[in-house]
Amino acid sequence: MVTAAEKWKSDLALWAIPKEILDQAVEKPWIHPPALFEIPEVIKDSLSHQRAREAMPIGGSVLDIGCGGGIGAFAITPPASHVIGVDEQQEMLDLFTNNAAKFGTSVETVLGQWPAVADSTPVADVVTVHHVAFNVGEIVPFLAALNARARKRVVIEVPVVHPMSNMNDGWKHFWNLIRPTVPVAGDLINVLDEMDIEATIEYFEGEILLDKKVDGANGFIRRRLCLPEERQGEIDAFIAAHPLPERRHLAVIWWDVQ
């Protein structure tokens, strides 16, 4: 019988770009513009931030996994006064550190991939991880390490469907490629059930900020679709006819550590 964790891994594998498409790509498609991870002066509240904040003691600590600029951490400072960021890119940790100075919090950073660096990462009152889980095939050790580093609560934010789903029409139009419809956020609850972790999932909506935060957002989409620069005009025309939605469906999955 296939476990929920095995299904999660196999479903994610369906999202691999076919080799023949990837091999012809002039530019690597898996780019993350730093502008996407900049945080505003005033962070809009969300259900994810609320669930993290309500478990945070005054003056407590938050550990942000795959932190980027740290929106998951700085949204709850205060009441948190100490932030810890984990990221694979030093550029993101530098951004996280600079933001800590702006928000007036003490800061620690850990360079590396989660959960490989978990043992060298401090424990915190609340652990947050925003928009990372859909990149993780080996999901059980990832979740177990989150649980082990939280004193009070773990809060995970993910889109309801795979984050690349908003480009499915583009893949069909330019490559006649049908993209998967699995996994979905609720599948993580099944994995957590298998781990004997009693978690709650709640749904809400949030903004899509790609075109607002990234100069040349259409070029970003072109690269994600493995198309060369000379086809940018076709991309621009396609996006004009099929604009990205302004809102997206999100889920927050959280549990209190026993």
Where are the regions that the model predicts?
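Short alpha-helix
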Residues: 181-196, 202
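Conserved Class I S-adenosyl-L-methionine
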Residues: 200-258
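Conserved class I S-adenosyl-L-methionine
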Residues: 1-56, 153-180
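A short glycine-rich, Lys/Arg-flanked "PGG" loop and its adjoining helix->strand segment in the class I
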Residues: 140-155
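Class I SAM-dependent methyltransferase SAM/SAH-binding core
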Residues: 63, 69-116
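A short acidic, Gly/Pro-enriched loop at the edge of an enzyme's catalytic core
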Residues: 119-126
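A short SAM/SAH-binding and catalytic strip from SAM-dependent methyltransferases
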Residues: 126-138
